[in-house]
């Protein structure tokens, strides 16, 4: 299999000594990202203050993320984590009697349930859809999303097995019931093309450290400009206010657009890193990345099955997973053994996740699968 991004591999120093297929947890750090981190450090070290430069990088990152998902810049908020973003939305969603239902699935990342169950006004109106062999199918959303539903939360990609959801179909179901669609795209942005307008997404969150190739400390929240006015954030701060009221302690005025969800100063070093990572992804093109990844994951599934591995999600053509989830007896021990051989994978629950990115080769994935087959 041809590696179309061979020239980019030199940008990732870790690849010279390791096989890095743990992007579902932490993507490989590139030289441009490292240089951006050094720029932040150097500017602060040499000049003592870099506030103007940091805010400029924040606005650049906001614009790059908006472009990546097909949004407008004023529809993006920059926050510290996906959990903060979800909490911001949950605490700002207005309660309407008879229209207070919250729908999510048992396959969503646990923070989703933690946050929504902490909202007293919505707690008794939560519907957690039970998965069927790790999948939640469209017919289940048809059944559980009703005229009483206020918001449907969906993971575009399942964090344990890579199962991909059909967002447009779920958006149609939600909107038919006058509900909002809130997408957790942490496991998809950077490897799967996202167009929030075409997909009918109302709200979306994604952090930078996984397939976006950044580091922890920054997440992006998209809120459609057609939906923003219904939200009056209670989790807020001075950056969530209109500029004229930021230093008026008595008369706060929520900022226009998604910025109203911002709180205080973010981790600027993470912003610098995310900005560089986003520029790299935009240069390469996520559509091109997806085309290669489809081939690579197809190869991974086929080779894994030939080796007798038990892959969690059945490969059925149209539902090719975005990562390989391999069942093993002792995931932590297997993860440690692989890492001792410079193979970076990610253990989650009872599976080892093999999650390549555009910089990986078929040979690297084959070697990891062969090693897993020898230990399972």
Residue ranges and their predicted role:
Residues 1-376:
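Pyridoxal 5′-phosphate
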């Amino acid at each position: 299999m041809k590696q179309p991004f061979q020239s980019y591999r030199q940008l990732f120093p870790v690849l010279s000594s390791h096989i890095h297929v743990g992007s579902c947890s932490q993507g490989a750090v590139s030289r441009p990202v490292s240089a951006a981190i050094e720029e932040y450090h150097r500017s602060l070290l040499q000049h003592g203050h870099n506030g103007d430069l940091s805010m400029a990088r924040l606005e650049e990152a906001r614009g790059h993320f908006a472009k990546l998902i097909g949004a407008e810049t004023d529809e993006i908020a920059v926050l510290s984590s996906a959990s903060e973003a979800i909490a911001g939305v949950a605490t700002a969603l207005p309660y309407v009697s008879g229209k207070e239902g919250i729908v999510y699935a048992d396959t969503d990342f646990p923070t989703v349930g933690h946050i929504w169950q902490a909202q007293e006004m919505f707690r008794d109106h939560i519907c957690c859809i039970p998965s069927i062999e790790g999948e939640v199918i469209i017919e289940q959303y048809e059944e559980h999303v009703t005229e009483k539903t206020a918001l449907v939360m969906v993971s575009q990609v399942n964090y344990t097995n890579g199962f991909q959801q059909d967002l447009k179909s779920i958006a149609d179901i939600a909107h038919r019931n006058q509900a909002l669609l809130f997408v957790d795209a942490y496991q998809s942005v950077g490897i799967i093309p996202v167009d929030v307008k075409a997909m009918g997404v109302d709200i979306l969150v994604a952090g930078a450290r996984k397939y976006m190739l950044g580091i922890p400390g920054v997440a992006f929240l998209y809120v459609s400009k057609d939906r923003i006015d219904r939200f009056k954030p209670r989790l807020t701060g001075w950056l969530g206010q209109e500029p004229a009221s930021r230093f008026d302690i008595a008369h706060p005025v929520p900022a226009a657009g998604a910025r109203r969800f911002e709180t205080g100063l973010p981790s600027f070093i993470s912003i610098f890193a995310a900005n560089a990572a986003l520029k790299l992804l935009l240069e390469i093109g996520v559509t091109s990345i997806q085309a290669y990844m489809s081939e690579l994951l197809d190869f991974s599934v086929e080779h894994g099955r030939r080796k007798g591995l038990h892959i969690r999600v059945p490969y059925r053509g149209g539902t090719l997973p975005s990562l390989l989830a391999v069942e093993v007896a002792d995931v932590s021990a297997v993860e440690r053994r692989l890492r001792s051989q410079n193979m970076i994978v990610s253990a989650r629950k009872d599976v080892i996740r093999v999650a390549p990115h555009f910089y990986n080769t078929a040979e690297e994935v084959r070697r990891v699968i062969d090693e897993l087959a020898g230990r399972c």
